[in-house]
């Protein structure tokens, strides 16, 4: 019964709400409502017993609602502007090694320097004596504070490392002593115009003089007194006996009139090369046709292609030739003499006609 009454009241209120046009109607009607009517406006689940509430929950499950409070964009912008900027930590000051000139941290430089000095001693002992350098001394810390003292100490350490460099003789570039030897293998001198390396210390000058004297020069050569070719001082004693044997074999193959006496080894003189060049020139034989000088074995090869003949043998052939050949030569001369006046006769005859003189035969 009670449920029916409540439903009727709620239906009447809904109908009057839809048909009423005044907003104050609900307020007036709310005053006449009893406590039971207030409970009827609430959901049914709230007015039901606990046992009945469980049954209704199993039948209808309504999802729960969550309210999210979204902050305004202006607030986020203002908060980001008010936050201070993040400043990165200051980079530690690097220190320059006074031996190799590289940079290290303030804590690792103390570990590096003893190892670098030990390596320097090992590499310095492997170098030639004229390229060895004195042990580099650590520059004293300068008085100052902050970044100025660090910069000054790094500059002094860098100058100490640069003092270990040696200039190249060819190009003038500076290298460490161990790197200089590697560079000199591929560095080619540019000529006399290459700039000379400048060095302030006397150690550089003495080292450069020793380095120049220590560069490998061309080995001295000696001329063979038989063939006239150049050989080294060590290979010449091996060459001379073989060259003399070869000379004897070639000399025996020549005609008898071209045989040469056995060459003699010259005595050593201060001018060794000039004294040895003389006997080798004495072994040369002149060609009878062109008067060029050759060695005895090369003369035969030259005579095969030499076609020029001297004038002396031709005159002898004319004088010692047969009578027929002499007659032929005289006849040819007479024919030439006859042919010559015929040309002159024509010239004289033409001149006489031009002058108006009577033509006639020219008597010779």
Curated annotation (Swiss-Prot):
Binding site for Zn(2+) 3: 224, 227, 239, 243
Region (Disordered): 43-64, 127-148, 187-215, 259-280, 305-345
Keyword hit for Cell cycle: no
The protein's required cofactors: Zn(2+)
Binding site for Zn(2+) 2: 168, 171, 183, 187
Annotated binding of Zn(2+) 1, by residue: 97, 100, 112, 116
Binding-site residues for Zn(2+) 4, renumbered to this chain: 287, 290, 302, 306
Compositional bias of kind Polar residues: 306-334
Gene3D superfamilies for this protein: Classic Zinc Finger
Entry GO MF terms: zinc ion binding
Ranges annotated as C2HC/C3H-type zinc finger: 93-122, 164-193, 220-249, 283-312
Alphabetical keyword list: Metal-binding, Repeat, Zinc, Zinc-finger
One Pfam family it belongs to: zf-C2HC_2
Low complexity composition bias: residue spans: 138-148
Family matches, as InterPro entries: ZC2HC1A/B-like, Znf_C2HC_C3H
Domain of life of the source: Eukaryota
Protein name from the UniProt record: Zinc finger protein 474
Organism: Macaca fascicularis (Crab-eating macaque)
Originating gene: ZNF474
């Amino acid at each position: 019964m009670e449920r029916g009454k409540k439903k009727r009241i709620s239906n009447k209120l809904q109908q009057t709400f839809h048909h009423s046009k005044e907003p104050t109607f609900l307020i007036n009607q709310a005053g006449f409502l009893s406590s039971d009517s207030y409970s009827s406006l609430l959901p049914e689940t709230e007015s039901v017993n606990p046992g009945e509430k469980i049954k209704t929950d199993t039948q209808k499950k309504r999802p729960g609602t969550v309210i999210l409070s979204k902050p305004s964009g202006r607030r986020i912008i203002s908060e980001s502007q008010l936050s201070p900027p993040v400043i990165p930590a200051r980079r530690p000051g690097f220190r320059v090694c006074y031996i190799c000139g590289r940079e290290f941290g303030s804590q690792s430089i103390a570990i590096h320097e003893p190892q670098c000095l030990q390596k320097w001693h090992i590499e310095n002992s492997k170098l030639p004596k004229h390229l060895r350098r004195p042990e580099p001394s650590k520059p004293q810390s300068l008085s100052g504070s902050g970044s100025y003292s660090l910069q000054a100490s790094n500059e002094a350490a860098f100058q100490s490392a640069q003092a270990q460099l040696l200039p190249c003789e060819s190009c003038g570039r500076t290298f460490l002593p161990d790197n200089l030897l590697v560079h000199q293998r591929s560095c080619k001198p540019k000529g006399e115009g290459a700039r000379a390396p400048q060095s302030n210390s006397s150690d550089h000058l003495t080292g450069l003089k020793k380095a120049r004297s220590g560069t490998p020069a061309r080995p001295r050569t000696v001329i063979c007194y038989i063939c006239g070719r150049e050989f080294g001082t060590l290979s010449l004693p091996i060459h001379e006996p073989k060259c003399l044997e070869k000379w004897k074999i070639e000399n025996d193959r020549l005609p008898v009139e071209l045989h040469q006496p056995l060459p003699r080894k010259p005595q050593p003189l201060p001018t060794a090369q000039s004294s040895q060049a003389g006997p080798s020139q004495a072994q040369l034989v002149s060609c009878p046709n062109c008067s060029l000088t050759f060695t005895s074995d090369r003369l035969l090869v030259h005579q095969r292609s030499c076609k020029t003949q001297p004038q002396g043998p031709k005159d002898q052939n004319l004088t010692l030739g047969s009578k027929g050949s002499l007659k032929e030569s005289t006849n040819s001369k007479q024919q030439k003499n006859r042919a010559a006046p015929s040309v002159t006769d024509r010239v004289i005859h033409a001149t006489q006609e031009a002058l108006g003189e009577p033509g006639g035969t020219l008597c010779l």
